[in-house]
């Protein structure tokens, strides 16, 4: 197979591991910076061009698109989909997952338990918004933030009002969420491929920090998840239409709560913690899906 990895930086751990896994399974791989792509959009002969050349068709595309380039990155991914390439995660699902508010609304509609979350526009609603999520302490999140950036713990009502007003002064869209005390700065990252949770780790925030993201100095350990946690992680990924997802879960007294679903989960933390070859599992999943596509096309052609 010919596989394209859409990424701005091919030296990142996840990109290198995916390339190694694909090449070890005898596939050819090209890492493509989506911002260096340009597209010919027409019904007769659509194409993707890259640094002065027209790209040949790829059998599969793996999107590793940063949140800052979601709009253009998913446009490029969509063009590859038009050309018949199999997307590990399709453009619609990636966009869905990147919109934190929309994704939470979709998860809630499917009955998936979440931290109590508020969203408002008018400054006049700040007081009731804080009360609606259970009061302080609470968490204020930028809708467009990633890796723990733009996430603030407000320990008092006055602090919460100040943080919310400051973000609004920047014309930023924010979510206000209850702070789950019993989680104690920990969360569970479930790595979903298809209909399986293939790995799970527990992430612990460093001392003096409440965000458990490994990028912010948190630590990780292998963890055994419950059947309920496994089921909710798979359902969350499926609800957003993702074949591969990192589903972050808080262990609350009332049961597991889905905090976030990541469409481009990093491999370094989970592979080094569990010792599992997640990259190889992802390539194997692509092989299975593309083989089924070929088989289906062959059957249709004969009918």
Swiss-Prot record:
Binding locations of ATP: 141, 178-179, 187, 211-213
Protein family according to the UniProt entry: Belongs to the RimK family.
Example GO molecular function: metal ion binding
HAMAP family the record matches: RimK
Entry keywords, A to Z: ATP-binding, Ligase, Magnesium, Manganese, Metal-binding, Nucleotide-binding, Protein biosynthesis
Enzyme class: ligase
GO-annotated cellular components: cytoplasm
Keyword Protein biosynthesis among record annotations: yes
Biological process according to GO: protein modification process; SOS response; translation
Cofactor(s) needed for function: Mg(2+); Mn(2+)
Domain ATP-grasp stretches: 104-287
Record-given protein name: Probable alpha-L-glutamate ligase
InterPro entries xrefs: ATP-grasp (IPR011761), ATP-grasp_RimK-type (IPR013651), ATP_grasp_subdomain_1 (IPR013815), RimK (IPR023533), Rimk_N (IPR041107), Rp_bS6_RimK/Lys_biosynth_LsyX (IPR004666)
Keyword ATP-binding: yes
Database matches in Pfam families: RimK, Rimk_N
Residues engaged in binding Mg(2+) 1: 248, 260
